[in-house]
UniProtKB/Swiss-Prot annotation:
Mediates with IER2 FGF-signaling in Kupffer's vesicle ciliogenesis and in the establishment of laterality in the embryo. May be involved in mitogenic function of FGF1. One of its GO terms (biological process) is Kupffer's vesicle development. It is found in: Nucleus; Endomembrane system. Disruption phenotype: Morpholino knockdown of the protein causes severe deficits in laterality. Partial loss of Kupffer's vesicle cilia with the length of the remaining cilia reduced. Double morpholino knockdown of IER2 and FIBPB causes an almost complete loss of Kupffer's vesicle cilia. Keywords: Membrane, Nucleus. Interacts with IER2. The keyword Membrane applies. Disulfide bonds: none annotated. The keyword Membrane applies. It comes from the Eukaryota. GO terms for molecular function: fibroblast growth factor binding. This is Acidic fibroblast growth factor intracellular-binding protein B.
Length: 355
């Protein structure tokens, strides 16, 4: 007599319980939530069975956690039989983070000191302390791994942590801000969300870093290109040379007359606004001024426009003509640097210009 025997030991994972575990809930919390959701009736199970099942799930997740901290090990381990699509789900969800949590630690040093403050972050955001710690440790882990790598930041994060493109880009923001230590905590910047900063980080990484110029560069592309920052000083001529400043103003006013409601306010404040943008550029050779980029944009450009009741449409038209009209100034010789600077600044200001 021949007998074929098939043994299956696929690990059964409940995605809903996994999410609750990630969110920092206790076993008793999860049991209560499952009972409230009618699981006992649905499965015709007793509370003891439900408790036992929840404990088993938690134990499985805790055993998986060590593997999830080095995602490439998940596919090669033999302890759990987990289908590849579920492996991807486990990794992605483990590394997902709450944007309100990320906003609180953005730009801070990923150190023990910051980790000690997570009690306050938890109280402020309503996110469980356990979840805050997991998210913070993930930020720190990704930063430490990619800090030593050469080449494109987003690709390095994807390759080593097997994350989706969107999530890898969000982590690139965390790494970029931790590396450059941009000021994000001042009161005047509190209206800006993590998504606002993530957009700006993407612009800076794409156009101002060493990797933006040469993706075979030895360094990681989170470092702003020093030669570019040094060359920004040449833009000062645009506001220091009275003839150039007057010509620039005349060109922009000629283009915008009758097209924006705040024309008179724009005409009156043109020189101050232009000086603000050019002075921000010329000071970026200093580490402190790089850190203050966002607060400078808010205080020296966004707030004056806001107080004069500019709409987003007014601002977009102004920045477009302000940027492009420079190309017709024959005495101005720094068009390439200007375009590289203003392309990013325009995008960031438009993203940051909201209540």
């Amino acid at each position: 007599m021949e007998l074929d025997v098939f043994v299956g030991n696929t690990t059964v994972l409940d995605e809903d319980i996994y999410q609750l575990w990630l969110d920092g809930h206790s076993v008793s919390d999860v049991v209560r939530q499952r009972m409230d959701a009618g699981v006992l009736l649905e499965c015709e199970a007793s509370p003891d069975v439900l408790q036992s099942d929840t404990i088993d799930q938690f134990r499985t997740f805790q055993m998986c956690e060590r593997l999830l901290q080095s995602p490439s090990k998940v596919a090669n381990q033999l302890l759990f039989q987990i289908p590849s699509d579920q492996q991807a789900m486990l990794i992605e969800r483990y590394y997902e983070f709450d944007s309100v949590f990320a906003r609180e630690v953005l730009g801070k040093k990923l150190s023990k000191g910051t980790k000690k403050d997570l009690d306050d972050v938890s109280a402020k955001t309503g996110i469980a302390l356990k979840s805050c710690r997991r998210q913070f440790d993930n930020f720190k882990r990704v930063f430490k791994v990619v800090e030593e790598l050469k080449g494109p930041l987003v690709e390095n994060i994807q390759r080593h942590f097997l994350l989706s493109d969107d999530l890898a880009r969000d982590y690139a923001t965390i790494v970029f801000f931790a590396n450059s230590r941009f000021e994000t905590g001042k009161r005047k910047l509190q209206y800006l969300s993590f998504q606002d900063f993530a957009f700006c980080a993407g612009q800076l990484i794409s156009y101002w870093t060493v990797g933006a110029v040469d993706n075979m560069i030895e360094d990681m592309d989170v470092d702003l290109e020093k030669d570019f920052l040094h060359d920004l000083k040449d833009l000062k001529v645009l506001v220091n040379d009275k003839d150039l400043l007057d010509q620039h103003k005349s060109l922009v006013c000629g283009q915008l007359r009758g097209k924006i409601k705040v024309f008179n306010e724009m005409e009156a404040s043109f020189k101050n606004l232009s000086r603000a943008l050019v002075n921000i550029a010329s000071k970026l050779t200093h580490a402190k001024d790089v850190r203050d980029l966002f607060i400078d944009l808010v205080e020296k450009f966004i707030e004056p426009c806001r107080s004069d009741k500019w709409t987003s449409g007014d601002l977009r038209l102004f920045l477009t003509h302000y940027s492009t009209s420079v190309h017709t100034l024959e005495a101005f010789r720094h068009q390439v640097i200007w375009d590289r600077y203003m392309g990013v600044i325009k995008s960031c200001i438009l993203k940051m210009y909201h209540d």
